[in-house]
């Protein structure tokens, strides 16, 4: 998917990018490849592949109507090089975006990237989701939490649901169908007072399969969740 194909595909879906937004995506690509020489950000560095498998892929929640350009709080857990939240931020500049990532080098990249792209309303924190999830400044503060290929739902739910306000949504993006994951996560979601409202398979323009799962938070998360760092992965709910 060339940049021109990318812009045309977005336009056909009702998103006519400004020159500034096009420049932001172009500069994002350049910095991603440049910094990838120094720190491991991605295995995908071919321009057409980045525009398809990172940028277009990240925008699925917006293109499908689940995230709109409004002034709400979005948290991205384990965003790595900023996916999916920073492409979403470029397309929806009114969003307030927070990223938590466990590698400080990636946070350094994200700070530099956001300055270069002229993004405002973005905040980056180094640390573990389990620790931030027990911090009152972060717990139950977000309308949406995104996670792209972070962990299976049984684990991911404990790492993300505590950050949501009641009525907020977890939007999880994956490469494979999530049916079995949701079966395995049934107990975790019950314990966390959360409920799946969407589990949908779709295809990228090149035919690659993808999945989007949306989970609603129904009630306040019990205080003991998330458990200490590492425990959700070792002993899933």
UniProtKB/Swiss-Prot annotation:
Primary localization: cytoplasm
Class of enzymatic activity (EC top level): transferase
Keywords (A to Z) from UniProt: Cytoplasm, Methyltransferase, rRNA processing, S-adenosyl-L-methionine, Transferase
Localisation per UniProt entry: Cytoplasm
Residues noted as binding S-adenosyl-L-methionine in the record, renumbered to the chain: 78, 83, 129-130, 148
Keyword Transferase set for record: yes
Source taxon at top rank: Bacteria
Intrachain S-S bonds: none
EC identifiers of the protein: 2.1.1.-
GO cellular component: cytosol
Nucleus keyword on record: no
SUPFAM superfamilies assigned to the protein according to its UniProt record, in alphabetical order: S-adenosyl-L-methionine-dependent methyltransferases
GO molecular function: rRNA (guanine-N7-)-methyltransferase activity
Pfam families per UniProt: GidB
NCBIfam families: rsmG_gidB (TIGR00138)
Family indicated by similarity: Belongs to the methyltransferase superfamily. RNA methyltransferase RsmG family.
Function: Specifically methylates the N7 position of a guanine in 16S rRNA.
Record's protein name: Ribosomal RNA small subunit methyltransferase G
Organism: Streptococcus thermophilus (strain ATCC BAA-491 / LMD-9)
The encoding gene: rsmG
């Amino acid at each position: 998917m060339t940049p021109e194909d990318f812009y045309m595909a977005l336009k056909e879906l009702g998103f006519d990018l400004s020159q500034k937004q096009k420049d932001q995506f172009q500069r994002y690509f350049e910095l991603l490849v440049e910094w990838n020489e120094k720190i491991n950000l991605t295995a995908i560095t071919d321009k057409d592949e980045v525009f398809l498998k990172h940028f277009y892929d990240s925008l699925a929640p917006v293109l499908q109507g689940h995230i709109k350009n409004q002034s709400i709080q979005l948290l991205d857990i384990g965003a790595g090089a900023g996916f999916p939240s920073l492409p979403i931020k470029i397309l929806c500049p009114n969003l307030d975006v927070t990223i938590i990532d466990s590698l400080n080098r990636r946070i350094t990249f994200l700070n530099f990237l956001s300055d270069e792209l002229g993004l405002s309303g973005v905040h980056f924190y180094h640390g573990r989701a389990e620790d931030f999830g027990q911090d009152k400044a972060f717990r139950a503060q977000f309308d949406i939490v995104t996670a792209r290929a972070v962990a299976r739902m049984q684990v991911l739910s404990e790492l993300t649901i505590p950050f949501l306000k009641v009525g907020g949504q977890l939007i999880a993006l994956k490469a494979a169908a999530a049916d079995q994951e949701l079966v395995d996560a049934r107990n975790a979601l019950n314990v966390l007072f959360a409920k799946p409202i969407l589990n949908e398979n779709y295809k990228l323009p090149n035919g690659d399969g993808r999945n989007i799962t949306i989970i609603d938070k129904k009630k306040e998360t019990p205080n003991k969740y998330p458990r200490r760092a590492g425990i959700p992965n070792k002993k899933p709910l």
